[in-house]
Amino acid sequence: MDKMNPPALGQASALFPDLEPPGGVGKATVLLGGSTGLTSSDMEFQKMLIDERMRCENHKTNYQTLKVEHTRLQDQYTRAQNELKRLLSDRQVTQEKQQLLLAELRGELLDKTRDLEELKLQVLTPQRLELLRAQVQQELEAPIRERFNKLQEEAENYRSEYNKLRYDLTFLKSEFDHQKEEHARVLEERRIRHEADVARLEHDKEDLATQLQSGDPARDGKRVEALLREKAQLHQRLRGLEAEVTELRAERNNSGAQAENVQRIQIRQLAESQAAVKALEAEKQSIRMQLDRTESELRLSQEQNTLLTGKLHKAEREINSLNSQVEEMKHTHKLELSNVKLECVRSKGELERERDMLQCQVEGLQSDIEVMKSALERNKELISEKEREMVRRVQAAREEEIHKMATLQEEKLELENRLSELEQQKALQEVTGNSQKEEWEERLRAAQLGEESVRKELQNLRTKVQQQGQQLEELETLKAENADLRQQIAELNLQVGTLSHSESELLDTNNRLRESLERVREDLRSARTQMERTQQEAERLVEERRVEWLEEKHKLQDIEAELREKYSQAKERLQRAAFAQKKRKTMTELKENKLKDKIQLLEAKIAELEIEAKHAQLSKRLRELQRRHNEFRRLLLGNQMTSSTPLAQSLLIPNESIFSNIQVSEEQHQRELCVLRRRLEELENSQQQQLEELAAPLDRDRERLSSPRDALPDLS
């Protein structure tokens, strides 16, 4: 009950006036005055609420109108943006078309300039003709000069090799003659020596035979000593002869190796000369092929000249067609440029009109925004004043409630004091009290509902204030968008300026293209005249070149004939060298046969010397036996003179047998010596016959070799 509202207490006091004591009339009047004050404040509060609701409705209507205006402005802005995008896309398309046209025209201009450069390059100027002539002459003369130099170098090499071979041949011939003379001298000396040795041996043999027949022991001893000395000398001579035989064998081997080396060298030289001859023939064929090639190239160059003249006429026709196309393109380009200019002017006027409209709209929006800002400021001031008034009223209501609570507590104390008095009346007043209580509760509920409605209205006001803040933010975004639109308008103005600049550049490029076309026409006229002159000069040069080629052909044929003569001469020389090589080979074979015969003779002499040595040994043994026999006989004769006859007879019998054996061996030795002499005579006769047979062809070869040697020219 202590939380009961003051209006309810006022109503309770108004409903129960008879409950107050007689002394509490002033207090009741006070309470009634407070209740009337409370009702007037409620009325004011309700009026304020109604005013606030009206203002809120006004704000709502203003907000709705602002929202509709904002949507309309947004639609206009989107339309303006779409229109700007469309204009930008159209402008971009037109720019792309113009750039494509410009690129195509530039490409065509570049192609035509390239064709003109190619035609200029194809046009034969006198300088280019001179360069071509020099280049062709270098290309044709360079391989021929290289081959001619190579042929000269090879001829020099062959000449030097031929001189070397000639010098080697003369040196070998002189060496061969010297060796032949030396060999003949050595053979003659050895033959004389062997004849002297044979005569001396025969004389010694006769002396030995006489000594054996005479039988003088002292003289035999001396002769044995002399024979021993002779034997030692013969051994030394035998060793010397063996050394000479080994030297002769080594010389034979060396001469065979030298002959083989010379033969191999000559075979290699023959092969090299044959290869050189083949190379010369191949080069001759290559020169012929090159001549054919040069003639075919000359024909091809003439055909190419005719083709170039045809291409030149075709290029002139194409240039005329291209000039007509360029004129057509110029005309179409002018029409397109005029259309583009008209479209640019039209789009420029539309853009200016739209810009003015947008500026008007932006100014209207700015004025609306300023009005709305001032209205918002006023609304903010009114809301702040109302909030301050509401705060003051709430504080006053709270103070009144506190005061009323204090008075209620006092009344409560008084009522508690009176409760005891009122308990008796309670039963009577329960029905009326319950009804009053319900009424009071209903009033309390109504007051609570009013308080809640006030709170809701405060919340609604706060939400409205927040919405107004959002609207202010949206207005700021609109300001930013308007600034963006202004920037876009400035960019569009810049693009319009660039379009006008590009239009002026296109006009300049068209003028330059016209000038370049005029220059190209003049160049074509000059090129045509120059082509005619160069064609005449080319025909004249072709005739001169044909004459030069014929002269060079005759020169090459003369060179070929000279090379053939040189080749035939070299071939004859090589044949003569091969014939001389064959002769040298036969001579070396004859030398080998002679050396073999000499070796056989030496081997026979060595065998004879061995037999003589054996004979000397046997004679030595015989003399030794004779000496011993004589000593034994002297001993026997000195000691037993009486009985010497039978012993002497017995001793003489073996002596006779010994002498018979010696005679048999001596006869055998004589037979062997006769056989050896016969063999030696046969060998000498065969050698003499071979020498006589070889002498005649050698003399003929010498005469032949001397005659070509005198006839051969010195190539150095």
Swiss-Prot record:
Region of interest (Disordered), residue spans: 1-20, 691-716
Lineage of origin: Eukaryota, Metazoa, Chordata, Craniata, Vertebrata
Name of the protein described by the UniProt record: Centrosomal protein of 83 kDa
Chief location category: cytoplasm
Consequence of gene loss (knockout): Reduction of olfactory cilia formation.
One GO CC term, this protein: centriole
Family assignment from sequence similarity: Belongs to the CEP83 family.
InterPro entries: Centro_Cilium_Assembly
Known function: Component of the distal appendage region of the centriole involved in the initiation of primary cilium assembly.
Record keywords, A-Z: Cilium biogenesis/degradation, Coiled coil, Cytoplasm, Cytoskeleton
Highest taxon in the source lineage: Eukaryota
Coiled-coil intervals, chain numbering: 55-638
Keyword NADP among UniProt keywords: no
